[in-house]
Amino acid sequence: MSLLLRDFERADALDAALSERLIDGLVAAIDARGEAILAVSGGRTPAGLFKCLSEAPLDFSKVMITLTDERCVPLDHPDSNAQMVERLLLQRNAKQSRFIPLYDSAMDRAAQCQSLNLQFNRLPIFDAVVLGMGLDGHTASLFPGATGLPAAMDLSSDTAVTLIQPLTAPHARMTLTAARLLKTRALILHVTGDEKLSLLNEVRAGAGAMQYPVGLFLAQNAPATEVFWAP
């Protein structure tokens, strides 16, 4: 297990450092290939990060942004990750970026999943993926015990996006699979709080990936997971 841990005294210091880390990678991608692609998570944790990113001096017209996962709810629902991204990240300088949402409430879910797979399998590998983590060890929408979890965690799978039903959280989800999330140049885990740090240490000690799906990502060496943590 190759894991790089960066810890900060305050969440705002973490947000600034992680934003700088991501911008450096996106700039390098644009310089090398003319475009960059970033996958971000929703939830409460990345709110400050999104604000930092939105203000960064970057040519966002050359950046694609997508989500690691999405709840199957309308865009105006308070649990919508896309709504959060549009409200906090796709502002100021980042307004120019191209956003790829994972859910449209007007479409049939199965048809939408098929369409997303075609789209994501045509996209290049990510330049950075920013994951979060729940206290149950889930990341993206890879929840312990969820219907569809083994297939979504299969690293040999060609499936990029799958529909998953958590047993312990509301709403069906569209999630990028583990195999697609790991097609990235940089893999970052963004976590806050002492409880989550304790869980990380437990997972690093050898808890199984089906018990704590985040463990699958922490176990990767290429790319190694970069953990950004603050209390």
Describe every region a protein language model picked out.
Residues 1-2, 231:
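Absolute protein N-terminus
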Residues 2-112, 119:
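N-terminal active-site beta-alpha-beta segment that forms phosphate/nucleotide-binding
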Residues 13, 74-231:
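Conserved phosphate- and dinucleotide-binding cores of soluble alpha/beta proteins
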